[in-house]
């Protein structure tokens, strides 16, 4: 089958990465369709809907490239699958990662299903990751060539079935080259700045946004031995290892969040970047997903490396099944400020094996007060 007989539906955001993705596929001769996903009603404080601006950029890019385009609304799916999860996690005192859930439930589920209904053979996005297709048909996901932009951390929940239908055309090139291609082609998005932060918050103040949905409950900020250091403005506004926004003055080392007590509405703080309470030996994680589950013996356990947050260096770990629903991930050396609700993502070299959601964090067999 020649490329012209292969239909690829590209998820287009109005940014430079997805614009170049569509251009590259068109140049390679594929039958390309651009689709803009509207996942959130994101009118800003001035009454301007940024999604409209982004869609206008998609229209212009698609016209420049010479491909058809559509818009599809996934606001209900996004609310049900991503935003509800986001709020529930904050209610539990955890720090969620909505990008991971958005990829799992929207971009590579709702959008993938929609694309297949349009007769697509594959979907493509502007993610910095790579797909390796083996002769027997199974696939592996590899880190993007641009280490600084690699996005496999956020794609850790994707299954073999999902990835077999996915292309990441810019995963083999660096961001600077993506910009160069966009400028060379005269694409209107060539100099558009990258979006940052959580898509549904955008440029809004995080505290203000969250308080619209969850009532803040101020409480005491104390040390682990009970010394009161001040007031917090609501546990949901703080994450493990956080330094800024505590409002604790005085001399000596800066103060950091080392735990939360939901029952008593207490925020635990301690002084010093390397305070002992910030370090742990192992974690328990649930909702785990592996691209090739049969390659990993969870009963015997296996060694690999892991990331506990985006752009963090890999850490050597040992992964083993804890029970039917959870994994135990033991670190080769203590790790600082691991955060419940975030993803732990596993690697063998450049291959992303999969990931899980961090539930509890332990030191010397004792559970830390990260979220209790």
Curated annotation (Swiss-Prot):
Q: Which residues bind ATP?
A: 11-18, 37, 126
**Could you tell me which CDD domains the record lists for this protein?**
MnmA_TRMU-like
Q: Would the keyword Acyltransferase be found if you checked this record's keyword annotation?
A: no
Q: Where is the active site?
A: 102 (nucleophile), 199 (cysteine persulfide intermediate)
One Gene Ontology cellular component annotation? cytoplasm
User: Which reaction equation describes what this protein catalyses?
Assistant: S-sulfanyl-L-cysteinyl-[protein] + uridine(34) in tRNA + AH2 + ATP = 2-thiouridine(34) in tRNA + L-cysteinyl-[protein] + A + AMP + diphosphate + H(+)
Concerning Gene3D superfamilies, the annotation shows:
Adenine nucleotide alpha hydrolases-like domains, HUPs, Translation factors
Family matches, as InterPro entries: MnmA-like, MnmA-like_C, MnmA-like_central, MnmA-like_central_sf, Rossmann-like_a/b/a_fold
Note whether tRNA processing occurs among the keywords: yes
Q: Where exactly is the site Interaction with tRNA?
A: 127, 342
Where is this protein found?
Cytoplasm
Keywords of the record, alphabetical order, are:
ATP-binding, Cytoplasm, Disulfide bond, Nucleotide-binding, RNA-binding, Transferase, tRNA processing, tRNA-binding
The region called Interaction with tRNA is annotated at 149-151, 309-310
Report the SS bond pairs: 102-199
Q: Which GO terms describe its molecular function?
A: ATP binding; tRNA binding; tRNA-uridine 2-sulfurtransferase activity
Q: What is its main location?
A: cytoplasm
Q: Where is the stretch described as Interaction with target base in tRNA? A: 97-99
Superkingdom, natural source = Bacteria
Give the E.C. number(s): 2.8.1.13
List, in alphabetical order, the GO biological process terms annotated in this UniProt record: tRNA wobble position uridine thiolation
What does this gene product do?
Catalyzes the 2-thiolation of uridine at the wobble position (U34) of tRNA, leading to the formation of s(2)U34.
Q: Which HAMAP family match?
A: tRNA_thiouridyl_MnmA
Question: Member of which family?
Answer: Belongs to the MnmA/TRMU family.
Official protein name in the record: tRNA-specific 2-thiouridylase MnmA
From what organism does this protein derive?
A: Staphylococcus aureus (strain MSSA476)
Lineage of the species this protein comes from: Bacteria, Bacillati, Bacillota, Bacilli, Bacillales
